[in-house]
Amino acid sequence: MLAVRRRGLRVLAVAPLRVRGLATTSTEFMEGEALTPKTVGPYMSERLEEFRPERIRNFSIVAHIDHGKSTLADRLLESSGNISRQERESAQFLDNLKVERERGITVKAQTASMLHRDSKTGESFMLNLVDTPGHVDFSYEVNRSLSACEGVLLLVDCSQGIQAQTLATYYAAKERNLHVVPVLTKIDMPHAEVDDSILSLSSLLDVDPDEVLLTSAKSGDGINDVLPAVVERLPPPVECDPAAPLRCLLVDSYYDDYRGTVCLVKVVDGAISPGDKIYSAHQKTKHDVQETGLLLPGRYKTKGLYAGQVGYIIAGMKSTTEAKVGDTFFREGAASADLKALPGFQEARSMVFASMYPTDDSSFDELRVAIEKLTLNDASVTAQQETSGALGMGFRCGFLGLLHMEVFHQRLSDEQGIQVMVTAPMVPYTVIDPNGEHLTVETPGAFPESTKYYEILEPMVEASIITPASYLGPVLALAKEKRGVQTNLVYLEDERIIVTIDVPWQEVVTNFYNELKTISSGYATLNYREIEPQKADIVKVDLLINGKVLDALSFVCHRSRATPDGRALCQKLKRVIDRQQYEISIQAALGGKIFAKERIAPYRKDVLIKSGKTVGGGDSTRKKKLLAKQKQGKRRMRTVANVQLSQDAFWSVLSK
């Protein structure tokens, strides 16, 4: 059977589909004319009430990072007439952020409504597509996108095969009882392993090989089969009642400079129109609906949204903090009519914390405004003002993961033009004091100096690593070095192995991913999920410069790593701190005891030479007075002077 499919692929490779032919699914809608980006909006708006729940399909594209989700989404948008060929070829249409296009990743989930006509029955269907991020840090975005869907396209790059995040998104979809359509992409690549990928899907995920779609978003091969499969194999919105009182699910939100918060919603029951007054089930707030519409993916205003449909509403919210993802909206006055909020509400929880300080103290207000603007579009970032003795005023920010932190840092520079100093990331620890009280510690400064009478709970994750069998030894060695415990080992058909380990979350955010890629020559992939915290011997290491503790450079680690990490940090700081006219002493302390020290020697001016001549001639008393005066001046300078620390000093902590 696989051999037959392989022969079919060869035929496709010889005669690839023409891009112009991709729009066939949209023909004959308007007296024989295909829909275009200018006509698709008016056509759908005029017939919006005709799209009952049974003629709607809500679906997501899920996959590992860089497996081609956004590229496939652009192809589908082109095939349905939402975007032109030129728009599709110029850039990935659903990736709007500069950081997304520079890194080639999706950070912010986007949505687009499409129109498709069934060639067999002639019926037209509304297809609502959600393009989701692929990196594990943004699994929160993936999960909230899945809450608005009844099915997913599980995308697998057949040149790379099933990866760690592929499995994670598949299981997330199955937990929600979503229907899955497997799709292989990049079949036109020279090193594509189509047969092996189909076998892996069949054995690992129990997928019928005959149901796997074969596509190439780059060349257009197989794209015409995707939307018909969505209509035939995915169910319509379930438990939707057009006659029931309004209930709609808040899926996402973003901030518009002119209109305020734009809410992406799925209407579950009833209908919503401009002028309606709505009530938030979790926020307990009331809002007036000013505008409703579809995302095509640009906003297109409509006279309402109906049961089963996904679109946007503008309700006069001034900030995305008023729009909690997963919230339920009722019509005002109906909250007392025994209506239940839709399940799945869960606030994003920060997993990594780091402090951000302006490079110039006078730029603090600019940094505050910049962070406020970015958090309007990313409600999963938390920011709290703090003060450091060494760096002045700044913000303690919480993120979903290390990549999330790096993306936020880059957006501050790209979009707001703000340069900041970022401290080493830290995960939240639970400290149990002698009275049994549980405290969550997010900064090294709040960590107890001595843990003799305290119990520390360390956050843990279950990490799934897919690696070629030849790299199993180095991967297990890395896991042991990071205090990981192996819990499972599964062999795949294509000489790859799934290794499951329980590992401290702090070890994962501290360069674990880069080291894994290095030892596996880039072949290993990583996915993780949070599990129960465990007791651990965690201590705080203080960094002192000229006897002063710098809270911004202190860090928390396991006791076994305190001495080597502290020594390494002192040595790195010695290399990045500029030499001064006075001696600089760099020390690392644990529990008040110094265990590592580095010295930066001062510049020495020869005070015994003036204008090329020796001062005092042969008078030794005069020379001793000059040397003693110089020594006293250097001691005074060391006492009152401040050592200037660059961003390199903080990144040396980050890469320890």
UniProtKB/Swiss-Prot annotation:
One GO biological process this protein is involved in is: translation
Give the reactions, separated by semicolons, that this protein catalyses. GTP + H2O = GDP + phosphate + H(+)
PANTHER family this protein is in? Answer: TRANSLATION FACTOR GUF1, MITOCHONDRIAL, TRANSLATION FACTOR GUF1-RELATED
**Residues engaged in binding GTP:** 63-70, 131-135, 185-188
GO MF terms, alphabetically ordered: GTP binding; GTPase activity; mitochondrial ribosome binding
Where mainly located?
mitochondrion
> Transit peptide span?
1-29
Put simply, this protein is called: Translation factor GUF1 homolog, mitochondrial
Residues covered by the tr-type G domain: 54-238
Which species is listed as the source?
A: Phytophthora infestans (strain T30-4)
Reported EC number(s) for this entry are 3.6.5.-
Q: Please, which domain of life does this record's source organism belong to?
A: Eukaryota
**Record's bilayer topology term:** Peripheral membrane protein
The UniProt similarity line reads: Belongs to the TRAFAC class translation factor GTPase superfamily. Classic translation factor GTPase family. LepA subfamily.
Q: Which key words are in the record?
A: GTP-binding, Hydrolase, Membrane, Mitochondrion, Mitochondrion inner membrane, Nucleotide-binding, Protein biosynthesis, Transit peptide
- Pfam families assigned to the protein according to its UniProt record, in alphabetical order: EFG_C, GTP_EFTU, GTP_EFTU_D2, LepA_C
Where is this chain's protein located in or outside the cell? Answer: Mitochondrion inner membrane
Q: Name one GO cellular component term.
A: mitochondrial matrix
Q: Which SUPFAM superfamilies match?
A: EF-G C-terminal domain-like, P-loop containing nucleoside triphosphate hydrolases, Translation proteins
Q: What does this protein do?
A: Promotes mitochondrial protein synthesis. May act as a fidelity factor of the translation reaction, by catalyzing a one-codon backward translocation of tRNAs on improperly translocated ribosomes. Binds to mitochondrial ribosomes in a GTP-dependent manner.
